[in-house]
Amino acid sequence: MRSRRVDVMDVMNRLILAMDLMNRDDALRVTGEVREYIDTVKIGYPLVLSEGMDIIAEFRKRFGCRIIADFKVADIPETNEKICRATFKAGADAIIVHGFRGADSVRACLNVAEEMGREVFLLTEMSHPGAEMFIQGAADEIARMGVDLGVKNYVGPSTRPERLSRLREIIGQDSFLISPGVGAQGGDPGETLRFADAIIVGRSIYLADNPAAAAAGIIESIKDLLNP
C-alpha cells in the first residue's frame, strides 16, 4: 500500500498558512485576507480544541482550500486509526503523523487515508530546539521507515537546513516535503525551498499588522523559486 504524493503545483506560491489562532473569527478573518495568496492551510490543535472540529469544514466551505490537520498523531495503531478516521470525516484533506511510534502506528494511518482517499504527512523531526534532545537522533531511521512504508509526503524543519537536506536525500526527489519554522522560528524561505517543496508560515503572517502584506512579502522574496 502506497500513499499518494501531493503535487507541488497544487500548493499556491509554495506557501502553506499555519493557522494556530485560537479564536474562530480572528482565524477566519486572517485567512480571508490572505486567501488570494494561499490555497492550503495547516490547522492545528489550538484552533480545533478552542472551536471544535467543525472549524475544518467551515474553512473548506468558506475558502475552498486544502486543509492539513496538524495533529501530530502519535499513539498505538488502533487509536491512530480512530483519530485519522475522525479527522478525515471532519473534512481534512491530510493529517500529520509522528513517525517515532513505529511502523505499525504509521501504517494504521496510511490504511485509513487510502480507504478515505486522503493523505498522510510523516513528521520525521520538529523545528524547535528541544527536538535535538531526543527525536533528531532517530530522524534518519524514521525517514527510511517512511520510504519502506511507501509514504510520499513528509514534514521536516526549516530551522536546520542541514537536516532538511539529509531528509531530502533519504526520501528522494519524488516525495513531497513541507517545512515549518520559517519566519518566527528563524527559518529562511529561500534556503528552505532548496530542499522543500513548500514552506509553512504561521506567526509571521497571522500576527502581522497586515497579514496580506506579510504573505505578499514572503512570496516576493521567493519569486525566483516559484513555478512559472
From Swiss-Prot:
<dbReference type="InterPro" id="IPR047595">
    <property type="entry name" value="OMPdecase_arc"/>
</dbReference>
<feature type="binding site">
    <location>
        <position position="42"/>
    </location>
    <ligand>
        <name>substrate</name>
    </ligand>
</feature>
<feature type="binding site">
    <location>
        <begin position="70"/>
        <end position="79"/>
    </location>
    <ligand>
        <name>substrate</name>
    </ligand>
</feature>
<feature type="binding site">
    <location>
        <position position="203"/>
    </location>
    <ligand>
        <name>substrate</name>
    </ligand>
</feature>
<dbReference type="GO" id="GO:0044205">
    <property type="term" value="P:'de novo' UMP biosynthetic process"/>
</dbReference>
<dbReference type="GO" id="GO:0006207">
    <property type="term" value="P:'de novo' pyrimidine nucleobase biosynthetic process"/>
</dbReference>
<feature type="binding site">
    <location>
        <position position="127"/>
    </location>
    <ligand>
        <name>substrate</name>
    </ligand>
</feature>
<dbReference type="GO" id="GO:0005829">
    <property type="term" value="C:cytosol"/>
</dbReference>
<keyword id="KW-0456">Lyase</keyword>
<comment type="function">
    <text>Catalyzes the decarboxylation of orotidine 5'-monophosphate (OMP) to uridine 5'-monophosphate (UMP).</text>
</comment>
<comment type="subunit">
    <text>Homodimer.</text>
</comment>
<protein>
    <recommendedName>
        <fullName>Orotidine 5'-phosphate decarboxylase</fullName>
        <ecNumber>4.1.1.23</ecNumber>
    </recommendedName>
</protein>
<feature type="binding site">
    <location>
        <position position="202"/>
    </location>
    <ligand>
        <name>substrate</name>
    </ligand>
</feature>
<comment type="similarity">
    <text>Belongs to the OMP decarboxylase family. Type 1 subfamily.</text>
</comment>
<dbReference type="InterPro" id="IPR001754">
    <property type="entry name" value="OMPdeCOase_dom"/>
</dbReference>
<feature type="binding site">
    <location>
        <position position="20"/>
    </location>
    <ligand>
        <name>substrate</name>
    </ligand>
</feature>
<keyword id="KW-0665">Pyrimidine biosynthesis</keyword>
<comment type="pathway">
    <text>Pyrimidine metabolism; UMP biosynthesis via de novo pathway; UMP from orotate: step 2/2.</text>
</comment>
<dbReference type="GO" id="GO:0004590">
    <property type="term" value="F:orotidine-5'-phosphate decarboxylase activity"/>
</dbReference>
<dbReference type="InterPro" id="IPR014732">
    <property type="entry name" value="OMPdecase"/>
</dbReference>
<dbReference type="InterPro" id="IPR011060">
    <property type="entry name" value="RibuloseP-bd_barrel"/>
</dbReference>
<feature type="binding site">
    <location>
        <begin position="180"/>
        <end position="190"/>
    </location>
    <ligand>
        <name>substrate</name>
    </ligand>
</feature>
<dbReference type="InterPro" id="IPR013785">
    <property type="entry name" value="Aldolase_TIM"/>
</dbReference>
<feature type="active site" description="Proton donor">
    <location>
        <position position="72"/>
    </location>
</feature>
<keyword id="KW-0210">Decarboxylase</keyword>
<dbReference type="Pfam" id="PF00215">
    <property type="entry name" value="OMPdecase"/>
</dbReference>
<dbReference type="InterPro" id="IPR018089">
    <property type="entry name" value="OMPdecase_AS"/>
</dbReference>
